[in-house]
Each structure stands twice: as C-alpha cells, then as structure tokens.
Amino acid sequence: TPSNLKIRSLTDSDLKNLENLHQKAYKYHLHQIKNAEYFSKLKSLNHEFYGLFQDGQLLVSAILAINESELNMEIVDFVTHPDFRGQNLSYYLVQDIKGQMNIYGCKTLYTMVRATSYGLNITFSKHGFVLAGTLTNNCMVRDAMESMNVWYYKEK
C-alpha cells in the first residue's frame, strides 16, 4: 500500500463518514444501505467494515459478512468515492481483506460484482479470485436488470 494511504477497520465513529461516502457513490442504491443506523445494525449481525483513507478522508470502503462457523467471508458491499474511481485504490483494500481471512479463521472469501464494473472485476482477478460464473439479469440496478459475476478466493 502506498505510504499516503491508510487501511483500517471502521469503528462506530466512522459510520457517518461511511454514510456520506455511500450517498456520494450510490445515487440509485437502496436507501437503507446509505444509512448509518443500518450500518450499525449490520455490525451487530457479524459484519465488519474496512476503509481506505487518504489524508483522513474515506475513499473506499468494504463491508464483510463474517461466517466463522462455515469458515467464509463475503464482501457484501464495495464502494469508491466517485472522484477517485479509476485509480485502482480498490486493489489495496482487497489485498488487506484477504489478509483478514486468517484473523477470522476463514478459508473462502467471495463476492458478487456487477458484470459491467470492469475495474473491480479486474481487481478480483489480479488477486487470484476465481470467476465462478455470471448470474444473468439477477439484480435490479436503477431501473434495469443487471448481471452479476460471482468471484471466490480459497486460502491455500
């Protein structure tokens, strides 16, 4: 990770900044995913939040659903500030998240990515994730159905 970037687990005091990031990045996303109260509820349901910061500003975040009994983690949400898209910042956060697998004792990390999100799909490929397949037209985004790619990474 470049020295001007910091990656860390988000705390309750970061939830308002996380809400602000989601509001900037997701104009057409479900309202609840933009809400600090909803994020707080997710924390109580064994979700962890990670962020990439530059000069104290949250630029990229990921929400992980941890399932320790089944030894897996799912990246359920990944967002980049609109002004910082295309700079490959997600690469560093995914790298850090892979390192969290050992902390939680997880063997598999998986996620679904919009098929048209080329940069994020490339990021997961670069990190050794395997493309398990594409779920065709299975997600409503804005006012249209979109396909989702399913990626997984198994700890060796």
Predicted feature residues:
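A short beta-loop-alpha structural element at the N-terminal edge
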Residues: 4-18
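A conserved beta-strand-loop-helix scaffold within acyl/acetyltransferase catalytic domains
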Residues: 19-82
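Short hydrophobic/aromatic beta-strand or adjacent loop that forms the aromatic wall/cage
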Residues: 47, 146-150
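Long, contiguous binding/interaction regions
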Residues: 73, 116, 123
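Conserved acetyl-CoA-binding loop-helix of GNAT-fold acetyltransferases
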Residues: 80, 86-101, 126
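Conserved GNAT acetyl-CoA-binding A-motif
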Residues: 101-114
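Conserved catalytic-core motifs of GNAT/GCN5-like acyltransferases
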Residues: 110-112, 128-147
